[in-house]
Structures are given as C-alpha cells and as structure tokens.
C-alpha cells in the first residue's frame, strides 16, 4: 500500500461530547446510572444491598495486573469491584479462590472480602482507605507479613484443591504457545533448569498446607489498623516454601544473607 487516503467529516461544535469520568457523564445525563443496562451495577446492588442511586464515586483502579477493578462508594463506605481480566478464568480456579477467601476472612488475614461469583469470577471487597505500599526494608512490616503467612500455614485449614508451581507454569506456557505468543530467547534452556530444580525440591517436600501462592509486597495492604493479605487467586494446598519463595523472589531485593535472615521471623 503506497497511499492510505483519509476523509474527514466535519461536525459542528457540540455534536460530540467527551466524558473523562463517570461523574462527568452523570452531570450530562443525571438519569444515566439509573437507566443503564449493566449486570455489574445489578451485582453491586444485590451484594451491597443498595439502590442504584446510592452508588457514587466510581473511579478505576490502575494497580491491577491481570484484572479490571474500580472503586465505588455507597452511603460513605468504599468498595472495590473486580472484573476478571480477559483469559484469567483459564488460569485461575475461582472456586478454589473463593474457598480460600472465606478461610482468610475467618482467620482474620483478609477483612476486605465480601462476595465472589465463582462462575463469572467477579468479586466485591471492602475498600480500606489510607493504605501504604509494603516496605521490604521495614523490619516490623516484614515480621507482621510473615506472621500472616505462618498463621495460614499453621491453621490446620485445608482446601480440596492443590497448587504445584512448576505444573502450573507448564500449563501457562502451553496456553502461550497455543495463542502464538513468542517465548523468550533460550527459554528451553531455562525451562530445563527449572524442571531440574523442581525435581530436586520435590525430594524434600513436606506435608502440604494451605498457601497463598502469590505472597509478596503488592498483595499486602499496610494500614493504620494492621495489614491485610489480599488477592487469593492462586491459593490452594502447596509446600509452604512456595509462599516464602514468592516473598523473596518477587521484588524484595534481598541478598542471599538477607533472605536467610528473615526465615526465623
């Protein structure tokens, strides 16, 4: 193609309206939220127990990696609605997640959970204002975080589902190949090394316990009232070392000695 002609249709001022936020749209059409056909709005009303008119302050949350989430307010109380990202239901067992969320709430590890639809994968949680990013360099925060993990591992709670990190990773690779995604250079060599390490670690496997399996900084909400362990999408029975390994490997920046020093905590 050497040419790509474009034609423009010039419209008069005021013919097209641009809205930067939900509030802008509602200012233009006060009845929009009351009349819009949205299962998401219906889900909120059913779980929270409110009328559509009570839902205000809708704003997107940009921190999510794989899901689409937004914040909203009902009668002055904040909530978060999570809509599962495209393809996430292929890699996340929503029944296992919902089960573990119930356990986490019972154990006092996550006070935010309200409801999850195990078929569609959407979830509603309470919003905790004033949360701070977890600091791997703060000894007290590290102590509290590892205490949450220990409480889970030693709770005696079990799950009908299990999670094997290497097997799960192989499943993800298969999905990527099926979708035609290019794998990194020398991936086969790295995969072989990981397979060998997985085998060696399996020789020392102890009793499986209920684990979070995504235990690292972004999933630890630090606030004035304590700390919450959120995002239980991969939680199931596993080797407790999986949680410790995640905590160290995903962004801690620890040296080998620093990683060893946190183990007694």
Region locations from a protein language model:
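ATP-binding pocket architecture of kinase catalytic cores
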Residues: 59-166, 181-189
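Active-site activation/catalytic loop segments of kinase-like enzymes and analogous catalytic loops
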Residues: 241-265
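Active-site acidic catalytic loop and adjacent metal/ATP-binding pocket
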Residues: 59-81, 198-242
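Activation segment
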Residues: 86, 130, 227, 235-237, ...
């Amino acid at each position: 193609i050497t040419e790509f002609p474009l034609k423009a249709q010039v419209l008069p001022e005021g013919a097209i309206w641009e809205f930067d936020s939900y509030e802008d749209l509602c200012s233009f059409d006060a009845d929009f939220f009351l009349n819009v056909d949205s299962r998401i709005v219906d889900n909120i009303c059913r779980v929270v127990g409110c009328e559509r008119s009570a839902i205000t302050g809708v704003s997107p949350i940009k921190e999510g990696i794989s899901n689409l989430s937004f914040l909203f307010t009902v009668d002055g109380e904040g909530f978060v609605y999570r809509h599962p990202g495209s393809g996430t239901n292929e890699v996340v067992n929503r029944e296992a997640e919902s089960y573990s969320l119930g356990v986490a709430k019972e154990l006092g590890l996550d006070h935010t959970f309200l409801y999850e639809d195990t078929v569609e994968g959407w979830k509603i949680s309470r919003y905790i204002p004033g949360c701070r990013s977890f600091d791997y360099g703060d000894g007290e925060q590290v102590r509290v975080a590892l205490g949450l993990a220990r409480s889970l591992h030693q709770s005696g709670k079990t799950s009908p589902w299990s999670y094997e990190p290497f097997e799960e990773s192989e499943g993800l690779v298969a999905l990527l190949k099926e979708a035609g995604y290019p794998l990194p250079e020398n991936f086969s060599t790295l995969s072989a090394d990981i397979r060998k390490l997985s085998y060696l670690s399996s020789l020392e496997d102890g009793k499986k316990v209920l684990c979070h399996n995504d235990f690292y900084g972004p999933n630890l909400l630090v606030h004035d009232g304590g700390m919450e362990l959120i995002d239980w999408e991969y939680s199931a029975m596993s080797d407790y070392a999986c949680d410790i390994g995640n905590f160290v490997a995903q962004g801690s920046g620890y040296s080998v000695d620093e990683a060893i020093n946190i183990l007694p905590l």
